[in-house]
Amino acid sequence: MKPALNVMGLRKMFGGLVAVDDVSFEVEEGEFVGLIGPNGCGKSTTFNCISGLLEKTAGTVEVFGKDVTELRPDQIQKAGLTRTFQHTRLWREMTVIENDLVPPRNQFGTTILERARSLFLPWRNPKEEARLERAYSTLDQLEVPHMAHNLTSELSGGQSKLVDIGRSMMGEPKLLLLDEPVAGVAGPLAMKIFNNLRNMVDETGISVLIIEHN
């Protein structure tokens, strides 16, 4: 069985600056792995190369046996990979559950708000009903169902992180990359986020790779 993620000899240079040098590791299916290190050590650059946002200088990155460099961004997602970013991209004028039903901010125009609102009208179709059910299920997995109808502008930083993670699960990824999911979050809530993530991994069998400072 191929690993969920296989990184071999990854190298990334910016001009004459070596940002990532000969990095190799694997993430098996159902495994929870962390890349830990201080600012400037190349964690985010590694993440960006894995998710196809940066073109690597050398090496190989495979997601479930498929070379990332041969895939378009939409094909990478279809291969099973989804990522979050350090700074959440939530629609602050929407509720938590509405955010779960639409793509991240800045990917579409403002009319996406009208689309999100329409999902709650009586004539929504069965496909949209299924997405709504999955959105509530994801909030249950992260133990935040009580926040479903709160505006995201009312959430704390840690709560926003949880909502962003929940939205990333809507596409049913097999490999989830989390960029500093507890950055700036107080200790008790940070531990809650990690515990909820571990429970989610156990329940769904997905693979998770995170980067953090410690």
Describe the residue ranges of each PLM region.
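The feature captures the beta-strand-to-loop junction immediately N-terminal to the Walker
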Residues: 36-38
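Helix-to-loop junction immediately C-terminal to a conserved catalytic motif
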Residues: 51
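Conserved ABC transporter NBD signature motif
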Residues: 59-66, 78-79
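Conserved ABC ATPase "signature" region
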Residues: 112-147, 195-199
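Conserved ABC ATPase signature
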Residues: 151-155
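Conserved catalytic motifs of ABC-family nucleotide-binding domains
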Residues: 172
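Catalytic Walker B motif of ABC-type/P-loop ATPase nucleotide-binding domains
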Residues: 176-180
